[in-house]
From Swiss-Prot:
This is Cystatin-A. This is an intracellular thiol proteinase inhibitor. Has an important role in desmosome-mediated cell-cell adhesion in the lower levels of the epidermis. It comes from Homo sapiens (Human). It is linked to Peeling skin syndrome 4: A genodermatosis characterized by congenital exfoliative ichthyosis, sharing some features with ichthyosis bullosa of Siemens and annular epidermolytic ichthyosis. PSS4 presents shortly after birth as dry, scaly skin over most of the body with coarse peeling of non-erythematous skin on the palms and soles, which is exacerbated by excessive moisture and minor trauma. One of its GO terms (molecular function) is protease binding. GO terms for biological process: cell-cell adhesion; keratinocyte differentiation; negative regulation of proteolysis; peptide cross-linking. Its main location: cytoplasm. GO terms for cellular component: cornified envelope; cytoplasm; cytosol; extracellular space; nucleoplasm; peptidase inhibitor complex.
Length: 98
C-alpha cells in the first residue's frame, strides 16, 4: 500500500461495526436524521497522522451510505470523528476517498 493511499476493500469486521456504532450519533446530528441499525458492509483504510476509515454501511433494505471516520494515533485524543459522509449510495458503489 502506498503511504497515504487507500487500502484494498475488505469485508467489515466487528471492530469496524463498533466504529460505525460509535459515530452513529455524529452522523444523525450532521444529517438531522435518525437511523435504525447501520450495518458495516465493507471498508478501506488510509494511514495519515492516524487512520481514516472509509466504511460502506447499509442503512435499510436498499439504502447505503459511505462514512469517513478518523481515528488518531494511540496516545493522542482517541475519540473517533466522523469527518465526512455520502448518502444515496447503492451496494455496488465503490468506496473512494472523499
Amino acid at each position: 500500500m502506498i503511504p497515504g493511499g487507500l487500502s484494498e476493500a475488505k469485508p467489515a469486521t466487528p471492530e469496524i461495526q463498533e466504529i460505525v456504532d460509535k459515530v452513529k450519533p455524529q452522523l444523525e446530528e450532521k444529517t438531522n436524521e435518525t437511523y435504525g441499525k447501520l450495518e458495516a458492509v465493507q471498508y478501506k483504510t488510509q494511514v495519515v497522522a492516524g487512520t481514516n476509515y472509509y466504511i460502506k454501511v447499509r442503512a435499510g433494505d436498499n439504502k447505503y451510505m459511505h462514512l469517513k471516520v478518523f481515528k488518531s494515533l494511540p496516545g493522542q485524543n482517541e475519540d473517533l470523528v466522523l469527518t465526512g459522509y455520502q448518502v444515496d449510495k447503492n451496494k455496488d458503489d465503490e468506496l473512494t476517498g472523499f
